[in-house]
Curated annotation (Swiss-Prot):
Species of provenance: Bacillus amyloliquefaciens (strain ATCC 23350 / DSM 7 / BCRC 11601 / CCUG 28519 / NBRC 15535 / NRRL B-14393 / F)
A Pfam family of this chain: BioW
Enzyme class: ligase
Subunit text: Homodimer.
Role according to the record: Catalyzes the transformation of pimelate into pimeloyl-CoA with concomitant hydrolysis of ATP to AMP.
EC number(s) from the headed UniProt entry: 6.2.1.14
Gene: bioW
GO biological process: biotin biosynthetic process
Involved pathway(s): Metabolic intermediate metabolism; pimeloyl-CoA biosynthesis; pimeloyl-CoA from pimelate: step 1/1
Protein name (database record): 6-carboxyhexanoate--CoA ligase
HAMAP family tied to this protein: BioW (MF_00668)
Length: 256
């Protein structure tokens, strides 16, 4: 029997101009799906792009390509939730978690000093904990974790097991975190959304799993953050290739 072909479907939306020409980022998303699910996937991404609280886009690109390499299976991370009622408390929790993950305190502070600058980056930044410098060399583009998905039936079972809401934001965030933490040279990830209505963020690490923090910024704030803390011995190009190009499914057990 011929093996089914999977497709990577990716969407990005901006306002006033495409991203490369300085347009304001509105939304992005992606799926790994077979032909039978393409229409549903495209419709879902179209809806996501036009229903974002950052505004209505006037530029949208939906790109499709077939997957011509094996899809790697990655297990979901262990999960914990930290209830915080102020952004300051949430950020304090994040700092403590990063330290537990193995990031030296002075390097955590160094990264935080650059967060305003990193907020202008469309993707993630790679931060070297040995030098305290950004090493991805991608300027405002950053690194976009791509070509991953979490099959709906498996995600639903996971939410029931962990008493988590069946929320597409959680699905997307956890899928990204799981792929990021699967790379041997990445120690931890610090993230919160640029969505002004979404104040939750997380720290993810091999040692800690996915640590969700309920309030990391104030409502109405359009600045976001995504920092990958690396161990200093990383092959930068190989790491970026894995994050952007290696197709991955998040799966609780077995193979897809």
């Amino acid at each position: 029997m011929e093996e089914e072909i999977y497709y990577s479907v990716r969407m990005r939306a901006s306002r006033d101009a495409p991203h490369e020409q300085g347009g304001k980022h509105i939304s992005g998303g992606e799926r790994l799906i077979t032909y039978s699910g393409l229409q549903e996937a495209v419709n879902g991404l179209l809806h996501k792009g036009f229903s974002h609280s950052r505004g209505t886009p006037d530029f949208m690109q939906i790109q499709l390509e077939s997957i011509n390499q094996p899809i790697k299976t990655i297990r979901p991370l262990p999960v914990a939730v930290h209830q915080t009622d102020t952004a300051e408390k949430g950020q304090a929790v994040a700092r403590k978690l990063l330290q537990k993950a193995g990031i030296p305190p002075h390097m955590i502070e160094k990264a935080y000093q650059n967060i305003a600058e990193y907020a202008e980056v469309r993707g993630a930044v790679l931060f070297d904990i040995q030098t305290g410098k950004r090493i991805d060399g991608r300027k405002e583009r950053g690194v976009r974790v791509s070509r991953m998905d979490w099959p709906a039936h498996d995600f639903q079972k996971w939410t029931l097991e962990h008493k988590m809401p069946e929320n597409p934001r959680i699905k997307e965030a956890h899928a990204i975190a799981a792929k990021v933490c699967a790379h041997p040279g990445i120690i931890a990830e610090l993230c919160w959304s640029d969505d002004p209505d979404y104040i939750t963020g997380y720290v993810a690490a091999k040692k800690l799993g996915y640590q969700r923090i309920t309030k990391m910024k104030n409502a109405g704030d359009e600045s976001g953050c995504r920092i990958f803390f690396t161990d200093g011995a990383i092959d930068t190009e190989s790491c970026i290739h894995f994050l952007e190009k290696q197709p991955v499914f998040i799966q609780r057990e077995g193979k897809i």
